[in-house]
């Protein structure tokens, strides 16, 4: 079974979000997503200073098997991107929740995360897909 962390929020498209102590929201793809994709070879993130919107495409992750859009769990301004992924995209495979995050957003309204799936709801989604 995939690693599903209790403190995170999830989308059915397999992205996760974590609210940081400074109020920003970090976004990446789940352990299930990286496993399904296989070896990640390229990550395209939004630019710092750009705006992302809840549920809209914000980037792309490519693997040896497929390419997949990355969606944001909140609307807001991108305040950081994970530069490590430019030179080491495989970090998404080895550490999807820690070193393999994609970008950070200063959310317009953090309560948008209330619409996202809890860890238990995400687990149920994965079980229903099996």
UniProtKB/Swiss-Prot annotation:
Belongs to the GcvH family. The glycine cleavage system catalyzes the degradation of glycine. The H protein shuttles the methylamine group of glycine from the P protein to the T protein. The modification N6-lipoyllysine is found at residue 65. This is Glycine cleavage system H protein. InterPro entries: 2-oxoA_DH_lipoyl-BS, Biotin_lipoyl, GCV_H, GCV_H/Fam206, GCV_H_sub, Single_hybrid_motif. GO terms for cellular component: cytosol; glycine cleavage complex. It comes from Cellvibrio japonicus (strain Ueda107) (Pseudomonas fluorescens subsp. cellulosa). Binds 1 lipoyl cofactor covalently. PANTHER family: GLYCINE CLEAVAGE SYSTEM H PROTEIN (PTHR11715), GLYCINE CLEAVAGE SYSTEM H PROTEIN-RELATED (PTHR11715:SF3). Residues 24-106 form the Lipoyl-binding domain. One of its GO terms (biological process) is glycine decarboxylation via glycine cleavage system. CDD domains: GCS_H.
């Amino acid at each position: 079974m995939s690693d599903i962390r209790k403190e995170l929020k999830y989308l059915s498209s397999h992205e996760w979000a974590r609210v940081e102590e400074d109020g920003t929201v970090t976004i990446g793809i789940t352990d299930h997503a990286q496993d399904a994709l296989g070896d990640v070879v390229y990550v395209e993130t939004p630019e710092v200073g750009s705006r992302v919107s809840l549920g809209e495409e914000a980037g792309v992750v490519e693997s040896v098997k497929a390419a997949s859009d990355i969606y944001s769990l909140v609307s807001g301004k991108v305040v950081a991107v994970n530069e490590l992924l430019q030179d080491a995209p495989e970090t998404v495979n080895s550490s999807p929740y820690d070193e393999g995050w994609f970008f950070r957003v200063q959310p317009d309204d953090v309560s948008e995360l209330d619409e996202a799936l809890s860890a238990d709801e995400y687990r149920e989604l994965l079980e229903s897909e099996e």
